[in-house]
């Protein structure tokens, strides 16, 4: 809980820096990149996927008991283009099967391919109950990337900086090179916008359907976990800045971009503060859009959060 409180304190401090509630709301759209059209399309796609899941035949994994899956494909018109949505829906008999087998089951990656206009994702459920907030968060996160790419008319991965980041992240997860790439990745503007768009989708769904305390949605969100990871990995990098393998990576980055270690860390630290600020303002926007009071500092947090069956999603 301490880590969450520290982050929430940072969020609160940047949220109230001389700004009234109305001041914050006025500049939210341009600063956060929260696009109402992306939110609308995300909700529609969630509903279409939920309908499609109901119609797909149940399949079973070989040698993995207590789990079934459905593979589906839908098409959808978004931002003037037809996109394809491929999904894998995995249902576990109960949490014990999820805990035991989830890491070993083949899953659809969560991504958007700009060249083929294809969104891919995995949807997980336990006893038929979908983790609705991860579902909403994932779709809006990836659709925000698509929206960003339609504005520049090419894939984000085409940029030189992004290529370097992805090359670093292709190394073993515990390596310093991976961690360097990861903190650079999390603090790019396009990723920060996508992360906070995902949080916005989860919050709005909650406020309209479940009214779970904001603390709990944030605590379970990918953006919160990204911010935690960013802070841990940055600290490890700073404590190992003389490491030989890390310096080989830094030399290669400097040769390709002319940017040194101090520049990268400065950029990361600015991005870290910006991400905390974006989270705070996304919460304000979601609560304003749903006409609810600010519950961010409610102390009576619950330890579990709502999951929905496919039927409940279809009726939402």
Predicted regions, residues:
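Active-site metal-coordination segments of metallo-dependent hydrolases
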Residues: 180-195
């Amino acid at each position: 809980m301490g880590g969450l409180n520290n982050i929430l304190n940072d969020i609160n401090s940047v949220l109230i820096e001389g700004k009234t509630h109305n001041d914050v709301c006025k500049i939210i759209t341009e600063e956060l990149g929260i696009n109402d059209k992306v939110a609308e399309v995300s909700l529609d796609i969630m509903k279409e996927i939920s309908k499609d899941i109901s119609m797909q035949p149940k399949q079973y994994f070989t040698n993995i008991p207590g789990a079934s899956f459905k593979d589906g494909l839908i098409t959808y018109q978004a931002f003037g283009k037809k996109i394809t949505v491929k999904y894998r829906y995995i249902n576990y008999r109960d949490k014990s099967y999820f805990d035991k087998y989830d890491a070993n089951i083949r899953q659809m990656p969560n991504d958007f391919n700009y060249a083929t206009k294809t969104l891919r994702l995995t949807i997980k459920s336990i006893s038929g109950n979908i983790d609705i907030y991860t579902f909403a968060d994932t779709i809006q996160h990836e659709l925000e990337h698509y929206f960003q790419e339609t504005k520049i008319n090419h894939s984000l991965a085409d940029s030189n900086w992004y290529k370097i980041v992805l090359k670093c992240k292709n190394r073993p997860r515990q390596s310093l090179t991976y961690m360097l790439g990861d903190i650079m990745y999390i603090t790019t503007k396009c990723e920060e916008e996508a992360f906070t768009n995902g949080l916005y989708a989860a919050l709005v769904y909650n406020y309209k359907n479940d009214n779970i305390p904001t603390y709990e949605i944030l605590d379970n969100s990918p953006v919160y976990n990204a911010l935690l990871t960013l802070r841990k990995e940055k600290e490890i990098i700073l404590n190992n800045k003389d490491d030989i393998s890390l310096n080989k990576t830094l030399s290669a980055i400097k040769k390709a971009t002319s940017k040194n270690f101090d520049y990268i860390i400065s950029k990361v630290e600015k991005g870290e503060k910006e991400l905390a600020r974006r989270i705070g303002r996304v919460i304000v926007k979601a609560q304003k859009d749903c006409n609810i009071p600010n519950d961010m500092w409610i102390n009576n947090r619950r330890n579990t959060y709502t999951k929905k069956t496919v039927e409940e999603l279809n009726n939402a």
